[in-house]
Design a protein with these regions (language model features):
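Distinct, well-ordered alpha-helical segments
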Residues: 71-78, 101-102, 127-129
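Glycine-rich phosphate-binding loop signature in dinucleotide/nucleotide-binding domains
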Residues: 105-111
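Glycine-rich phosphate-binding loop at the start of an alpha helix
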Residues: 47, 99, 121-125
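Short alpha-helical
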Residues: 69-70, 96, 122
């Protein structure tokens, strides 16, 4: 049988309107003990996906655990991207067991769930496995998650992937939403977010535009 290639994307690729992003427990108490990623990279990656999601109009849920009594506020890099958006504060370590959060998931009504947060082995594994068990497609932004050790993070990622979750990175998430530099309506936003938060890739964009007036869409 001869295969016939067509210039069309895989249905596995994310679109801005086909998923819900859930940002979980990006809070001081969890960050203090996170060792699998340094705090600077973690905050940059959290900011990148937050500003990307906001700019592309992705349905986003922000949730914390014991914010006032133990864990502290959500990272300002995230809340600044979603000014005025309410946060769902929980007692459950597994976000998927919180009725208010699940009510919001159902209200939004998307079959794809993208997860990021702290810690990978507790507050990300729980909702990932639970959502998969209920028939949702789950994606996990691995470098916008963290745990108390590399071992804890890596084993959690292994467990989720073995259950059917699809791993990705923060820059991959942003560029998957853009996907075509000819999409001029989001071009400046995407490159602006990358310049600010995407490390050496962002430096490269700044250099190319400054030195050569580069524009990827042409």
């Amino acid at each position: 049988m001869t295969l016939n290639a067509t210039p069309t994307p895989s249905p596995k690729l994310l679109e801005p309107k086909d998923h819900t992003l859930i940002l979980i427990d990006f809070q001081s108490q969890m960050a203090f003990a996170t060792k699998s990623i340094d705090a600077v990279n973690l905050r940059n990656n959290a900011a990148l996906i937050s500003h990307g999601a906001k700019g592309f109009g992705v349905s986003t849920i922000l949730t914390t655990v014991a914010e006032k009594s133990f864990s502290g506020p959500m990272f300002s890099e995230i809340t600044e991207a979603f000014p005025g958006q309410p946060l769902f504060d929980r007692t459950s370590m597994n976000t998927w067991e919180d009725a208010a959060v699940i009510g919001e998931v159902n209200r939004i009504g998307k079959k794809r769930i993208v997860l990021a947060g702290l810690w990978t082995g507790v507050c990300i594994v729980g909702p990932a496995l639970s959502a998969i068990a209920q028939g949702f497609e789950v994606y996990v932004i691995a470098d916008a998650c963290g745990d108390v050790s590399d071992e804890a993070h890596n084993r959690a990622m292994d467990r989720m992937v073995q259950a059917g979750a699809q791993p990705m990175t923060s820059v991959q998430y942003l560029l998957e939403l853009q996907r075509d530099w000819a999409r001029s309506e989001t071009y400046d936003m995407t490159t602006g977010i990358a310049k600010k938060f995407a490390g050496s890739y962002g430096i490269g964009i700044t250099y190319a535009k400054s030195m050569f007036g580069a524009s990827e869409g042409h």
